[in-house]
């Protein structure tokens, strides 16, 4: 992915997340601000920040590895989105008590701003990034090549990964030099 696309994507994630929380707050008012909901803020569970960090690291690692494996397996590529969605649904149920289930720094930051809740914010930046980078490295060591890393292959949109999947190209996309 070109640096400009990555930068724009990151900024858009944070701005979009914040806009979504603020719009929801405008529509739901006191219900979203209620202490029991507190803007859906993501905070470590009662087991603490270490457990929350490990939970976020593990879920991010497994999700990224699953996306890389399915999206780079020709027969499974069309199921990449389903695999990612199913894993995320399972994570919401199983992992939420430990970290609140984020896997996305923009999601956590966007809720933290109106809630003014910053406890453990660092781990929601460090753990998902570390887990996904580690998954990428494990994939490269295990399979050697990455052809594509996107969730949805069957569309006519520009591919920011330049993988050539939409053109039938079989050249690998290199994740790490």
At which residue positions do the language-model features occur?
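Membrane-interface helix-loop junctions and terminal tails of multi-pass membrane proteins
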Residues: 1-177
């Amino acid at each position: 992915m070109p640096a400009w696309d990555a930068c724009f994507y990151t900024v858009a994630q944070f701005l979009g997340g914040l806009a979504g929380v603020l719009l929801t707050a405008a529509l739901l008012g006191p219900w979203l601000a209620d202490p029991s909901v507190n803007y859906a803020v993501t905070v470590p569970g009662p087991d603490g920040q270490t457990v929350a960090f490990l939970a976020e690291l593990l879920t991010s690692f497994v999700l990224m590895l699953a996306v890389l494996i399915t999206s780079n397996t020709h027969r499974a590529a069309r199921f990449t989105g389903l695999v990612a969605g199913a894993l995320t649904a399972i994570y919401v149920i199983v992992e939420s008590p430990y970290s609140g289930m984020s896997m996305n720094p923009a999601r956590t930051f966007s809720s933290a701003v109106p809630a003014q809740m910053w406890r453990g914010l660092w781990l929601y930046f460090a753990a998902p990034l570390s887990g996904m980078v580690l998954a990428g490295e494990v994939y490269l060591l295990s399979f050697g090549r990455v052809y594509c890393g996107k969730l949805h292959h069957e569309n006519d949109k520009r591919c920011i990964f330049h993988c050539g999947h939409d053109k039938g190209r079989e050249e690998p996309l290199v994740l790490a030099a």
